[in-house]
Amino acid sequence: MKKNLYIFYLLIVFINGCDLFSTRTPEPPINKKTAFIPPTSSDVVVKNLQSSISEKNVDNYIACLTDNTDITGKQMFSFIPTSDVFAVYSSVFQYWDLYAERRYFNTMINATPRDIIPDLKLYNQQTIPLQQDSVIYVFDYLLSVPHSVDGVPKAVSGRMQLTVNLKHTNGLWSISTWIDTKSSNDSLPYSWSFLKAKFSN
């Protein structure tokens, strides 16, 4: 009898100590903050492009580029590199598409230390409305990406021309054509095209 009481008391102490029947408070989900804004106007696309780079967020970066296709199923997004880079890396840019954009961006970001924040500065903006659903933006740019790869510039400059279109199926804007050129205002010898080529593998 005493032995049974002893076991009973032990069970009570064990249950109270472990608190087996209490409900555990769930941990709050980990949400990574992002500055990405639904691109319901053309100018938001440019802001999202800048924030996706500083946040090193490949999904937000790709979301800035159109995923529209023509009647044959071919992607309508096109990137046209600087002429000097294309002369050397024509095979790289011959079939450049969204997958190539994702690949280069991921490679570049993976080579950048976690505590380092890339930066895209845009200057001398020109805005050229084409139609109600199409706008051209022209900027001089300075892109700084302090990565750890030897032989690849950590900062590039040039002039970018972005054709931004409205997708009528969802009411969102995105970049359909991106033209990269050198300009007389360039402070650095290498362009964004060169950076894309070097990180494309």
Feature names for model-found ranges:
Residues 18-55, 63:
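Short, low-complexity N-terminal intrinsically disordered segments enriched in polar/charged residues
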Residues 19-32, 134-136, 140-201:
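Short beta-strand edge/turn micro-motifs at domain boundaries
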Residues 25-32, 78-89:
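A solvent-exposed, charged loop/short amphipathic helix patch at secondary-structure junctions
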Residues 41-44, 48, 60, 96, ...:
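Extracytoplasmic/secreted proteins, especially bacterial periplasmic and envelope-associated proteins
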Residues 54, 63-70, 106-114:
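Sec-exported extracytoplasmic/periplasmic mature domains
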Residues 57-82:
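Short, well-ordered alpha-helical segments enriched in acidic and aromatic residues
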Residues 84-155:
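Surface-exposed, charged secondary-structure patches
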